[in-house]
């Protein structure tokens, strides 16, 4: 099977040809200035008169290649310490500019907005993302291999927006000390995109075509003259003081004050050392409540700032969730999920020439039967050709207990974005090999994935082996002892009709088999999505699954799934309203067979944005199951209320409940941004548990 997948992918890529793209991307020289403009969203300083100007935007959606409906003007300049952008988004109906979102770390998807990508190394494989909405919201992230941004990254930068009589304006400052770059690289990748939300119109500077996403960095333009850049001392120290009061059932109260320090030092403009003492994560966002009715563990993403910073340097083998050799979420938690305090942590991340480094060491305090210990993760990759990499990963230590454990891995990522001549089609081939050793359990795994990540056709096919005893102590494995095949095919059809923007056809197929080749589970899904020109979608689909149970499984207290081979088919459908509406919803309904019985489900999310200061959201997931072993219902609700009186102040209240644990969780957070990079938090967590029938 493995050889067959490789052969199919190689033949596919060979048929595509290997002619290099001849498309010439636009470029602009960035003028250096002496003075620093005031970031206030006005653009009235004399320095802006010296800035280079970009005006040649092309329409991407809804009518690719046609004239844009509104003019956009981008001003670019820099000092030796920062890059400055001034963007004038002209609009002949300024009263209709959508500017309702003020939140930091929000993409402002319902507002008129700008999206910017910067590639300081000009390799076309990864870069930085900056999102700005007309209401003042801002977001940042890391772009890798044409995928959507990883929004966990947090950058120190500044932006101010202002709605004017001519449209709206954004003024942006990106300090060079906040991003990694190569001092000898004077030409950077750069692209900018504007969205006029009420028209669902998308305009772009470089590669204004549906065939390339903004995040496909190989399609970016160039900004030149990026020389003699400075990062200052390269030292950033962030002291913090956490006061915590805890009240438990029974009347016991505790109060403590914990000081901590985070320090960042840029060894070079592209290499950073991070140190953290008495790391505290009180300000971390809570996980969304979910109910697990499967036989396998759930995956929860990392949300702690210390581990999210430069997390991309530890990515391995293109693996999304399982089997991960390293998942930092395991650090600071014992095997039974109890919190283990982190005494000290250190990282070295960045680039040295063609080498990419990620080194992490953490000292854990002893708690709950887990002795004090140190854990380590190291990741090194080497840039091949223009867009490819090979690398290794090593982890040492077991944060879950007192045993010893090591993981070793080798991977490669081959990418070429020059297929089919000037059309610039991209092909990728990713492979990995992993070995774990610890407490007498030694095993290995491997994986191979081929990707054709293009538009209108997208394809991904992969196969991986996960050994029965493969157990990365600092990673995550959902299901050991299997061969796992997965595939996904998508085609976007531009309708050209009056009401529809595009129609998407998606098909996925996958199976798990034991190491002897016996099928354990199968999953086939086909769905069609209709995207309206004014925003919003309609979706219908069908799914067929097969599950083999080799032993009885208690899906819920008293509800047993007997040994057997179960096949079931379900249909689903739903819709979502445009994100530009003040109120709206997303609904998905499903019904059909399930494990020898029936299941009906509803997944509903509603939002209301009455003004730029207030926003609320409620989501409900409800499943009704009628099985031979018994009937049961799962009900999960998540709600949030947000108040943003200014772009610097955010108050959020989250409420969560599920009917299985019968627990209500309440999380209140106040975040005051004193200045970019300096925040004050006030956090309240409350858990309510039903103790009796009343």
Question: Where is each model-derived feature located?
Answer:
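Outer-membrane beta-barrel transmembrane domain signature of Gram-negative proteins
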Residues: 207-230, 364-422, 538-592, 601, ...
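Extended, hydrophobic alpha-helical segments in both membrane/secreted and soluble proteins
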Residues: 239, 257-263, 271, 277, ...
């Amino acid at each position: 099977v493995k050889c067959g997948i490789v052969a199919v992918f190689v033949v596919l890529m060979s048929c595509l040809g290997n002619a290099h793209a001849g498309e010439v991307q636009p470029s602009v020289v960035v003028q250096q200035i002496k003075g620093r403009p005031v970031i206030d969203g006005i653009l009235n300083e004399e320095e802006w008169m010296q800035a280079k100007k970009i005006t040649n935007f092309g329409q991407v959606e809804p009518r690719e290649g046609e004239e844009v409906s509104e003019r956009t003007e981008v001003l670019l300049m820099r000092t030796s310490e920062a890059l400055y952008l001034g963007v004038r988004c002209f609009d002949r109906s300024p009263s209709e500019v959508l500017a309702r979102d003020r939140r930091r770390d929000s993409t402002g998807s319902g507002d008129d907005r700008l999206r910017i990508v910067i590639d300081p190394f000009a390799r076309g494989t990864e870069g930085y993302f900056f999102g700005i909405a007309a209401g003042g919201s801002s977001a940042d992230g890391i772009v890798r291999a044409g995928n959507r941004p990883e929004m966990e990254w947090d950058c120190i930068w500044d932006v101010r927006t202002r709605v004017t009589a001519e449209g709206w304006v954004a003024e942006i400052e990106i300090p060079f000390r906040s991003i990694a770059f190569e001092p000898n690289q004077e030409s950077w990748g750069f692209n900018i995109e504007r969205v006029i939300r009420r028209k669902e119109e998308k305009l772009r500077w470089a590669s204004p075509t549906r065939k390339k996403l903004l995040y496909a960095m190989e399609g970016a333009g160039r900004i030149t003259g990026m020389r003699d850049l400075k990062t200052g001392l390269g030292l950033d120290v962030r002291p913090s003081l956490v006061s915590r009061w805890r009240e438990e059932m029974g009347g016991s109260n505790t109060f403590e004050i914990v000081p901590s320090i985070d320090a960042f030092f840029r060894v070079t403009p592209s290499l950073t050392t991070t140190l953290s003492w008495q790391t505290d994560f009180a300000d971390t966002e809570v996980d969304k409540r979910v109910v697990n009715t499967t036989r396998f563990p759930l995956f929860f993403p990392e949300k702690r700032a210390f581990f999210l910073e430069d997390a991309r340097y530890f990515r391995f083998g293109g693996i999304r969730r399982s089997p991960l050799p390293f998942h930092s979420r395991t650090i600071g938690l014992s095997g039974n999920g109890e919190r283990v305090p982190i005494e000290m942590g250190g990282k070295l991340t960045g680039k040295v020439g063609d080498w990419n480094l990620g080194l992490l060491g953490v000292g854990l305090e002893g708690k709950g039967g887990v002795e004090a210990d140190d854990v380590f993760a190291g990741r090194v990759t080497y840039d091949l050709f223009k867009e490819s990499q090979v690398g290794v990963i090593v982890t040492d230590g077991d944060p879950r207990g007192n045993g010893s454990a090591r993981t070793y891995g080798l991977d490669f990522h081959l990418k070429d974005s020059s297929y089919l001549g000037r059309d610039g089609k991209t092909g990728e081939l990713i492979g990995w090999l992993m070995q774990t050793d610890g407490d007498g359990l030694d095993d290995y795994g491997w994986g191979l994935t081929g990707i054709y990540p293009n538009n209108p056709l997208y394809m991904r096919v992969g196969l991986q082996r996960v050994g029965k005893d493969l157990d990365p102590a600092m990673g995550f494995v959902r299901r050991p002892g299997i061969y796992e095949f997965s595939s996904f095919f998508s085609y976007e059809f531009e309708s050209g009709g009056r009401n529809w923007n595009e129609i998407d056809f998606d098909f996925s197929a996958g199976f798990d088999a034991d190491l002897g080749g016996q099928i354990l589970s199968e999953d086939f899904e086909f769905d069609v999505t209709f995207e309206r020109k004014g925003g919003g979608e309609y979706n219908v689909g069908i799914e067929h699954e097969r599950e083999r149970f080799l032993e009885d499984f208690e899906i819920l207290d008293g509800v047993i799934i007997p040994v057997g081979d179960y096949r079931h088919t379900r249909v689903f459908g739903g819709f979502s309203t445009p994100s530009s509406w003040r109120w709206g919803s997303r609904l998905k309904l499903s019904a059909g067979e399930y494990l020898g019985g029936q299941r009906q489900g509803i997944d509903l999310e509603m939002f209301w944005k009455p003004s730029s200061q207030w926003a609320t959201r409620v989501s409900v997931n409800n499943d009704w199951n009628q099985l031979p072993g018994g009937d049961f219902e799962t009900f999960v609700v998540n709600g949030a209320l947000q108040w943003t009186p200014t772009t610097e102040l955010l108050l959020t209240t989250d409420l969560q409940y599920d009917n299985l644990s019968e627990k209500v969780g309440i999380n209140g957070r106040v975040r005051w941004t004193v200045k970019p990079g300096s925040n004050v938090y006030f956090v309240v967590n409350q858990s309510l548990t039903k103790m009796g029938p009343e």
